[in-house]
Amino acid sequence: MKQLSAVTLAFLSTSTLFASPPIDSQLAPLAIMLADESNQNESLQPYKANDYSNLLGMPGISDNTLNTHFKLYQGYVKNTNLLLSILKQLSLEGKQSSPQFQELKRRFGWEYDGVRLHELYFSNLGGKGSKLDPNSPLAQAIVRDFGTYDAWKKDFTETGMIRGIGWVVLYQDPIAGRLINTWIGEHDIGHLAGGNPILIMDVWEHAYLLDYNIDRTGYIKAFFDNVQWDTVTKRFPG
């Protein structure tokens, strides 16, 4: 792999939409070259982006926002595969102790979490008019741990109003069984180890800025209006 160190440095400065500073224009062709090479080698593509076009037409979240969001998600998939390719090559060259390897290894979890969180998020949307069955095990667990559904929803909403970029995840502690609304900074800060993600809401600006400007509360209302509760309840093992 030619000029690997330059490509690695280029990757460190690449961005996905609204995520980080743009790539240096002189290094961009190298990153594109490596991405093109990996696209031609199926063995370097273990992850493929899912199609969520069925969500288009959702009330409260525009097609413009969704299409932009889909492209961003596809970028995380591409970068995850690209990182795997670079890390594999660095390992083959015996460069595991190099700063490039160590920084890209650190970056991998950020990109990978960006893939999986988006997949969980898109998958729990598309349920216009859907309601949580009050007799379901999930609803009963919510009442047990928060007192009422409304108290849980308020806590989830207020968690989504925390300043910063990230996610809100309703986690289940698989050992204690407890439900916990959790703030995730960016993609990788604050996850509950071993936790089971039940409901996921994206609160990066790209999820709502085009439709709601800085009105995050309006976006959160639209999110709840479109939750696919059938999918969410299936994530809860009871």
Positions of PLM-derived features:
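Feature for soluble, non-membrane regions of globular proteins
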Residues: 21-238
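Positively charged n-region of N-terminal signal peptides that target proteins for export
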Residues: 1-4
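Bacterial N-terminal signal peptides
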Residues: 6-16
